[in-house]
Amino acid sequence: LGLKVLGDMQKIFQTRHPVIIYPASGTGAWEAALSNTLSPGDHILMFETGQFASLWNKLATRLGLKTELLSWQGTDEHLPNAPGWRRGVQADLIHARLLADKNHEIKAVCVVHNETSTGVTSNIAAVRKAIDDAKHPALLMVDTISGLASAEFEHDKWGIDVSISGSQKGLMLPPGISFNAVSPRAIEASKTAKLPRSFWAWDEMLEINKTGYFP
């Protein structure tokens, strides 16, 4: 049964690579994604599209990461204090920022696919293209907690390194289960990442998952 569930989750994420399952909320899967791939003080680029993008940024800061939060460039008469909360990610801003990062200090780009608080959906394929066009090695991490199984999502095709999701939205299951879909690049990064982790550690989970069981 365990192997079937893991295989079926790969189909939902549209990936040939591992999907890790946690008994946790989506917040736990956020932390798992960051702690398995990054080290204290690493610089990450995030984009404010709503409440959950802001909360993910807050969590990353608490983990000891250096976060840089980009915001939508423009005005909104309905939300003058938070105009980006009614707009998706601007891939051109990510492209420009990565081009300026000549020393490749930015280790990851973190964006929300579908912002639960507003319903705004971002073009993840465009974000991947922005990273590639800038010839930047940053990992791409995507929160698709309310997007998975609700809107088109292609982990492999869109070149995502870590996709984060949960059970209670598009999958229409009880809350309390969350997921990391991980690329080979993400797994390789986890071998040198220095952020502390125990419960969230991918290595032991992946090893035992090969048998269809969990630690």
Task: For each feature predicted by the language model, list its residue ranges.
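Active-site phosphate-binding strand-loop segment of PLP-dependent enzymes
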Residues: 78-148
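PLP-dependent aminotransferase-like
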Residues: 28, 38-105
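Short gly/pro/ser/thr-enriched loop/turn and capping motifs at secondary-structure boundaries
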Residues: 52-54, 75-77, 147-149, 169-173, ...
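Conserved N-terminal alpha-helix of the aminotransferase class I/II PLP-enzyme fold
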Residues: 1-32, 51, 55-61
